[in-house]
Design a protein with these regions (language model features):
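Bacterial N-terminal signal peptides that target proteins for export
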Residues: 1-8
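Hydrophobic h-region of N-terminal signal peptides that target proteins for export
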Residues: 10-18
Length: 251
């Protein structure tokens, strides 16, 4: 999509046309990555400000697509977090529902909306970062262009329509112009950068351009988590009943 139109045209349409272009870019990015299901095994390196490194592993399964998907993320290592799991039920018109299962105490608990800014079990992902959101829950605006890892990108501001539905007041997306893959997300609270997520090692898997490495920077803590996606599959048969609280407890 070419957003560099003549100045006279912009004088006529104003900001509304600019916002429409931004929404189309984000929608195209989501459409190109859409699948009926997804599964992968992830290796995580959590690197603190003192360069101390801890290793974790999890499995991830998702059924459905953006805004109407369900997913379960389950730790498989190290032993102290093995079996800890998170169920996320996404919605098209509001924030997701989340439940966490802790096998050591055989208890599940609902994650309240106000708690989703906290770190997810010692990683630099917050609970909210693990959600999927529908584009209709946000307003978008093209800010310009930038280059991320050598790739030309659109720079797009995203703001939640319902301010209470997100810990972030705004985010800035960098979406690649060659394949519409999101290369970076910078998230802000009242204009202060709090988290940066970088996507790299992009491969085409089952005709979907897919980042195999996700790096999350927690700016305030000066720490980062590097997630490597392994054994990734799309559109494998899954059952809806495997994405319930009962399934979360079964393991």
């Amino acid at each position: 999509m070419n957003r560099f139109l003549v100045a006279a045209f912009w004088c006529l349409v104003g900001a509304a046309g600019f916002a429409q272009d931004a929404r189309q870019i984000v929608s195209e990015s989501q459409d190109r990555s859409r699948s009926r299901s997804q599964r992968y095994e992830g290796t995580l390196e959590v690197i603190g400000s003192s360069t101390k490194v801890s290793l974790k592993r999890w499995t991830y399964e998702r059924i459905g697509a953006f805004g109407a998907s369900k997913s379960i993320l389950r730790f498989s290592a190290p032993p102290e977090v093995k079996g800890v799991a998170l169920l996320i039920v996404n919605h098209t018109d509001r924030a997701s529902d989340q439940w966490m299962w802790t096998p050591a105490i055989e208890r599940d608990r609902r994650i309240a909306l106000q708690d989703r800014s906290t770190r997810f079990f010692g990683t630099d992902f917050s609970f909210e970062d693990l959600e999927e959101r529908d584009v209709n829950q946000y307003d978008f605006k093209v800010l310009g262009d930038e280059t991320v890892d050598g790739a030309a990108c659109w720079k797009i501001e995203s703001k939640p329509k319902e301010s209470k539905s997100s810990q972030y007041t705004s985010s800035v997306l960098a979406i690649r112009k060659d394949n519409y893959v999101t290369a970076q997300i910078e998230s802000f609270v009242k204009d202060k950068l709090v988290r940066r997520i970088r996507y790299s090692d992009i491969e085409k898997i089952d005709n979907i351009w897919t980042p195999r490495t996700v790096e999350v920077f927690d700016v305030g803590r000066n720490s980062r988590t590097v997630l490597k996606l392994e054994k990734l599959q799309y559109n494998t048969p899954m059952k809806d009943e495997d994405f319930t609280i009962e399934a979360l407890r079964r393991g």
